[in-house]
Design a protein with these regions (language model features):
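N-terminal helix-turn-helix DNA-binding core of bacterial DNA-binding proteins
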Residues: 47-88
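Charged, amphipathic alpha-helical coiled-coil/dimerization segments
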Residues: 98-153
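Basic amphipathic alpha-helical segments that dock to polyanions
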Residues: 66, 81, 96-103
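N-terminal leader segment of winged-helix/HTH proteins
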Residues: 1-56
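C-terminal regulatory/oligomerization modules of transcriptional regulators
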Residues: 1-24, 148-176
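Pre-recognition alpha-helix immediately N-terminal to the DNA-recognition helix
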Residues: 34, 45, 64-67, 125
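Helix-turn-helix DNA-binding helix
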Residues: 92-93
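Alpha-helical linker/hinge and terminal dimerization helices associated
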Residues: 42, 129-145, 158, 162-170
Length: 176
């Protein structure tokens, strides 16, 4: 006698907490589970990709800070980095900046009274190698899914919009 095959429709939604899915918008719990999975996978990817690019021992935030400092080849302040990366705890970005400085990937400067960070040649080269590894390992597999670049951009826009809703809900929860 063979066992009946299970399908996702017979099992229900894929969530991490059924008690959260038992509400007005169960799909939100599915989304949150997916966000948790992709968040952790993306952080692992950044760390491993940068290590493969020749710069081991960086955290995911270190990698993000380095990429943003290299972005558009303009010096950035800690406040700029915190705003763009949506990091509330300034000390985390400050620590990442010091670590990247000690590795020679960024250099400190000044804009008026504010400290700035600019990419060094070593930092730009590390980001270039990261891009090469990304193009070799990640880009082809994502392209092979058949998801169009337009659809990926659409998903990115939805995620950015949802981040605003989560931020507003966090502010409301903090005032309770």
């Amino acid at each position: 006698m063979s066992e009946p095959k299970l399908s996702t429709s017979s099992l229900g939604s894929i969530v991490s907490s059924a008690h959260l899915a038992d509400g007005a918008l169960p799909a939100l719990s599915e989304l949150e589970f997916g966000l948790n999975m992709i968040s952790h996978a993306y952080q692992r990817w950044m760390i491993r990709c940068m290590a493969a690019a020749g710069v081991p021992d960086l955290s995911a935030l270190d990698v993000l800070v380095l990429h943003h400092v290299v972005h558009r080849q303009r010096p950035k302040t800690i406040a700029d980095l915190c705003l763009v990366l949506d990091v509330e705890d300034t000390h985390l970005v400050t620590y990442a900046a010091k670590k990247l400085q000690s590795l020679g990937l960024v250099a400190a400067g000044r804009r008026g009274k504010e400290k700035t960070l600019a990419a060094t040649e070593a930092g730009r080269k590390a980001c270039g190698r990261y891009r090469e590894v990304r193009e070799a390992l990640l880009t082809p597999t994502v392209a092979a899914t058949g998801i169009s670049p337009e659809k990926l951009s659409e998903v990115a826009a939805v995620l950015r919009a949802l981040s605003g809703h989560y931020d507003q809900a966090a502010r409301a929860a903090a005032s309770l």
